[in-house]
Structure formats: C-alpha cells, structure tokens
Amino acid sequence: MEWVPARDGKLPEGRRVVEGGYESSGAKLYHALGVVNGVKVPGKAGEHLGGANLPFGGQEHVVREYEVLCWR
C-alpha cells in the first residue's frame, strides 16, 4: 500500500483506494492523511465529504488537500 495525493473529495484516477468503512448513510469512507497545524494526522475521506476530515486538538478539521491509502 502507499499514500497517494488527493484533493476536494476526488479519488486518484486509475488507483484502487483502500476502503475504511461506511457512513450511516452507506457512503464509502477511505483512509486519509493530512496536515493540521504542521502535524500529519490520520482521518477519513469520501467523495461526499469534499475533502478529508481530520480529528486534532478536540476538533474535526476539514482539509482540501490530503493523501489517501491505495493498493500498489
């Protein structure tokens, strides 16, 4: 597996993204890694989110540029 750049809720074309789970609505979630205040933070991404949601400092931060975990 490897981290691949993504942005704005779009998945990298031609890549198999590792699924991380589902929202209660059934929307797929993917493993994300992004930066909040200079710190790399794991979180979730989904096409329906328009970015990645990253928990940090007791809050959930939304970032537009992040990485998603993909199969090689």
Range-by-range predicted roles:
Residues 1-72:
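A structural motif
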